[in-house]
Design a protein with these regions (language model features):
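Active-site anion-handling motifs in enzyme catalytic cores
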Residues: 369-740
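N-terminal strand-loop element at the rim of the active site
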Residues: 5-61, 144-149, 159, 232, ...
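A short, active-site helix/loop in glycosyltransferases that binds the activated sugar's phosphate group
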Residues: 132-159, 165-169, 515-533
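A conserved mid-protein helix/loop that constitutes part of the nucleotide-sugar donor-binding site
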Residues: 13-24, 192, 196-218, 232-238, ...
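Nucleotide-sugar donor phosphate/pyrophosphate-binding loop at the beta->alpha transition
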Residues: 61-65, 100-102, 110-133, 146, ...
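Conserved acidic donor-binding segment of nucleotide-sugar-dependent glycosyltransferases
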Residues: 306-307, 311-318, 327-332, 687-694, ...
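Aromatic "clamp/platform" in nucleotide-sugar-dependent glycosyltransferases that forms part
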Residues: 255, 274
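Short His-centered aromatic/hydrophobic patch
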Residues: 81-87, 105
């Protein structure tokens, strides 16, 4: 494999480090050539590292002519560009040379020229044009991939990579006090040194660092701060430090080329950026075993796990930063423990070897796709379900399925039909079409291998016959267009209108290869309908495999709704349904009972943010005690994390029960649909009350029993874990149908 890399040659900071590390690793595995458009520190260092480097200076027409000759004579397979100038030149070369163009996006293009409107107008515009011409984009971190998707780039043509560092390098500073004093810092043996290496630009938000440091220093006067970097904000930041009265404890060290020596002189590494991809400042600090405090931006949470490998704070929140710095300053053992944990995680997952391997895998995937385009072979999956309709349960199923497919093949192109395709693209990192874009659907089916009817109760007609006909139509069209067809961890029924039974039987028997079901009741319904030809297996709901969100994220969400993180709560999840109005009073009395007798604060959670509000309001209006409402948009992991904080959960919504069951929380199910009864039976849960039989007394009794059962949480979680293990059969069948 031969790859030509194009870059201006004037780059500094993380982009320079990334390319030097990456090409040093790649040059040991494949033929790479680095082309710079100016000679300077960048090209000199690349040559010193042994990277084959060519400097082409001159006009754009002259450079293009030379590059076309190089590419033709050297038989390159790929053009890989970096930065505005490299991207622009690559966009002019890809057509004439007939090569795919891969572009790495190292930072947010809209922030690259912050406070430089002239440069933004010229270089930013050229870069925007070039990025749209690229065949494939590589975002430095998953967050950059998400950002590019939100800007309208195709999710299936974007890959992610993380900056890796060379862990064979050991940062050393034998006389750190002398070094720090030489920088101009007043310090002694008792000083705790906080540092940052960053440009003094607005996006790095050094002002928040200084404000947070000033707050921490009031509690821990031994703190000192070293700011290593240069930029337009230097005088503004000096004035800020003076205004806060910490100018004698803050050292502006200017730009430092001896980053490893600097890191070895610190006790705490920091990052305060408003936006990042995956900054080297974090991994370089990890290599030096430094305790780290970072803003929660970009891919940083992949490495810095709150309370384990470091501390995170909301970008721009000086008070939160100050609290973390003060805590680390007061506890040397905590600094050592976090520094070691960060080092071990970074060494395992974010080494230069891991980055090199990832880039090689991306190249292999790009070349494979180019070959498939030429041969007309199929690749990819299309998923259909009740997605983008505001229901946390259905969206959780999609999240789980996408995660399982990524484990099968991390580069698998995935397209999802959704009611809100933009939201689906951005949230799950997949391509998405509107569910009624039939022309687009047929176009996608002509190139995919596998159609997945993705979980949930799609084959039912109790809510609508038309929705049933829609899903059956998509199944038949998928098979007609040459796809394998799988119904993935789904529920079946109720089939209330028997006029549809024959159609269900015919279409499923003729078109479906595999059906996996979330409980045995669904298998019985299929058998009753006469479905016999597909391979069928009882597994479980894909959503059971989803993790809960990190503890600090859950705590912040509780506090947003005025709930103490250590409070005692009972959750209610209700929905509108036939006969609900007559039962709303029973829910209200049970919630009041939980508050007044059991000491549990009622919390209502909207699982379907579009539909559950009116039913929730109806119950709350009938209550005598106060109750909180958790509403708004949130991902599945956060919903699971919130439910994990409850002492008991009372839910009509199936996925409210599934999420809570996965965390071992005691349940009370109010069944309006056989799927609720079937799930509770599958986990051996007896507290299931049919909606039509619900009374205040039997609901209060169930709530009391659930509250009393809280201490036996581990037993219930083992049952849910067993179901999660059974769920793996879903992805095993998908792997088989994909031929992997």
């Amino acid at each position: 494999m031969k790859v030509i890399h194009l870059i201006s040659g004037g780059d500094t900071g993380g982009a320079k480090t990334h390319i030097h590390y990456l090409l040093s690793g790649l040059s040991k595995e494949i033929d790479v050539t680095l082309v710079c458009f100016m000679r300077g520190e960048f090209s000199d260092e690349a040559e010193a590292l042994g990277i084959p480097t060519v400097v082409l200076e001159g006009s754009i027409p002259s450079v293009l002519k030379q590059l076309k000759t190089m590419i033709r004579e050297e038989h390159y397979d790929l053009i890989h560009s970096h930065g505005a100038r490299g991207n622009f030149i690559a966009s002019l070369l890809k057509g004439p040379c007939g090569l795919p163009m891969v572009t790495t996006v190292h930072s947010d293009p809209k922030l690259d020229y912050l406070a430089r409107p002239g440069a933004a107008l010229v270089y930013g515009t050229l870069n925007d044009h070039a990025l749209k011409k690229a065949d494939y984009l590589v975002g430095v971190s998953d967050s950059m991939k998400s950002l590019l998707i939100s800007r309208g780039f195709s999710a299936n043509e974007i890959f992610s990579i993380y900056n890796g560092v060379d862990f064979s390098v050991v940062p050393e500073n034998p006389d750190r006090l002398a070094y720090l004093r030489a920088l101009g810092l007043e310090c002694d043996e008792q000083s705790v040194i906080v540092g940052i290496a960053a440009r003094l630009d607005p996006v790095k938000d050094i002002g928040t660092l200084i404000r947070g440091f000033a707050l921490a220093e009031k509690k821990q006067p031994q703190l000192r701060l070293v700011i290593a970097g240069d930029g337009a904000q230097m005088e503004e930041l000096r004035a800020l430090a003076q205004g806060l009265g910490v100018e004698k404890k803050v050292c502006f060290a200017g730009w430092r080329s001896d980053v490893n020596t600097l890191m070895a002189a610190l006790d705490v590494n920091t990052l305060t950026s408003l936006s990042e991809t995956f900054p080297y400042a974090i991994t370089e600090g990890a290599r030096a075993h430094l305790a780290t405090v970072s803003s929660r931006v970009g891919g940083v949470p992949k490495l810095v796990i709150e309370g384990e490998t470091g501390f995170l704070f909301p970008a721009g929140d000086a008070a939160a930063l100050g609290e973390k710095l003060a805590r680390l300053a007061a506890d040397p053992a905590l600094r050592r423990r976090m520094g070691e944990a960060l080092y071990e995680k970074a060494r395992r997952e974010f080494s230069v070897e891991a980055t090199t391997r990832r880039q090689l895998d991306i190249y292999d995937e790009v070349l494979r796709r180019e070959r498939l385009k030429k041969s007309g072979a199929r690749r990819g999956v299309v998923i259909i379900g009740a997605y983008g309709m505001g229901n946390s349960g259905d969206d959780a199923i999609l999240e789980a399925i996408v995660g399982e497919l990524r484990q099968i093949d991390p580069f698998l192109p995935i397209t999802v039909l959704s009611r809100r395709p933009k939201e689906t693209r951005e949230r799950y990192g997949v391509e998405s079409l509107h569910m009624f874009d039939f022309a687009g659907f047929h176009r996608v089916l002509k190139g995919t291998q596998l159609y997945l009817s993705g979980g949930g109760s799609l084959i039912q007609n109790v809510t609508s016959r038309r929705s049933l006909w829609y899903y059956l139509y998509t199944i038949s069209q998928a098979k007609k267009c040459g796809n394998r067809v799988m119904m993935y961890g789904c529920g079946i029924g109720p089939i209330a209108d028997e006029r549809d039974t024959q159609r269900i039987c015919r279409i499923l028997n003729e078109n479906v290869d595999v059906i996996t079901l979330r409980e045995s009741a669904s298998l019985q319904e299929l058998q009753r309908c006469g479905v016999t030809k597909p391979a069928m297996a009882v597994t479980s709901d894909p959503a059971l495999t989803l993790p809960e969100a990190p503890a600090d994220i859950v705590t912040a969400e509780l506090e947003k709704f005025g709930l103490a993180p250590d409070g005692s709560y009972i959750c209610f999840s209700v929905r509108g349904w036939t006969g609900f109005d007559e039962k709303a009073k029973a829910f209200a009395e049970a919630a009041d009972y939980a508050a007044e007798t059991l000491g549990l604060t009622p919390v209502f959670m909207l699982i379907n943010r579009d539909e559950d509000g009116p039913a929730t309001d109806e119950v709350r209006a009938l209550m005598e005690t106060n109750a909180a409402v958790i509403d708004g948009e949130r991902n599945s992991s956060l919903t699971i994390g919130l439910l994990a904080r409850m002492k008991a959960v009372v839910s009509m919504r199936l996925h409210g029960l599934i999420f809570a069951a996965s965390q071992g929380v005691p349940l009370v199910g109010v069944s309006y649909d056989p799927k609720v009864t079937a799930f509770l039976a599958s986990i051996g849960e007896e507290r299931c009350l049919p909606l039509e039989e619900l009374t205040a007394e039997n609901l209060k009794a169930a709530v009391s029993a659930a509250s009393a059962a809280y201490g036996d949480r581990d037993t219930r979680k083992r049952t849910a874990d067993a179901l999660a293990d059974a769920e793996s059969e879903n992805s095993a069948w998908a792997r088989k149908l994909l031929g992997l």
